[in-house]
Curated annotation (Swiss-Prot):
This is Holliday junction branch migration complex subunit RuvA. Residues 65-143 are annotated as: Domain II. One of its GO terms (cellular component) is Holliday junction helicase complex. It comes from Geotalea daltonii (strain DSM 22248 / JCM 15807 / FRC-32) (Geobacter daltonii). Residues 144-148 are annotated as: Flexible linker. Its main location: cytoplasm. The RuvA-RuvB-RuvC complex processes Holliday junction (HJ) DNA during genetic recombination and DNA repair, while the RuvA-RuvB complex plays an important role in the rescue of blocked DNA replication forks via replication fork reversal (RFR). RuvA specifically binds to HJ cruciform DNA, conferring on it an open structure. The RuvB hexamer acts as an ATP-dependent pump, pulling dsDNA into and through the RuvAB complex. HJ branch migration allows RuvC to scan DNA until it finds its consensus sequence, where it cleaves and resolves the cruciform DNA. Pfam families: HHH_5, RuvA_C, RuvA_N. The keyword DNA repair applies. The lineage of its organism: Bacteria, Pseudomonadati, Thermodesulfobacteriota, Desulfuromonadia, Geobacterales.
Amino acid sequence: MIALLTGKLAHKSPDFIILDVNGVGYRVQIPFSTYYALPEGGSSVSLNIFTHVKEDAINLYGFRTMEEKEMFQLLISVSGIGPKLGNGILSNIEAQNLSDALIRGDLARLATIPGIGKKTAERLVLELREKVKKLGHGPLQQDVAPADAHNDMRDDVVSALVNLGYKEAVVQKTVDEIGVAADATVESLLKQALKKLMK
């Protein structure tokens, strides 16, 4: 079972990376929080890995911290929460903020996450509140870009948000409302779009 990978960042996108480990490329799915923390392509990185084995595939999920990985494992231990949704949850809320919401029983906050309705939010609090406490997780404390860069960035952000469960038409409208400044990055646009979508 793979628990940690260290290698060269061969490819970086909002929902997955390819990590070159001694000439072997590993496709690793990641939450946005990990994406934001990654250096530029070609850099050496280490990620905590969760290996999900299915009958027809082996999927790797990577996290910048053990806290994120532990939270992911807690999430997928809940009935109805698979790895894809667990990853999506951590893309919408930082692990420490999620811990805080679970401990406080903040159903309203949890229910704003795509794929999490009221019943699922209640189940998360019921099943994970005490487990999170034991882990000790606490709360956290424009110019126009060139057309090609604008379109590429916009497409990346729209694709990433649609993969998280947001409707494409809503995402496109939100991203267009934000606009793309000359110094904008995919990370900054994702943060702005998520902030608007989660209101």
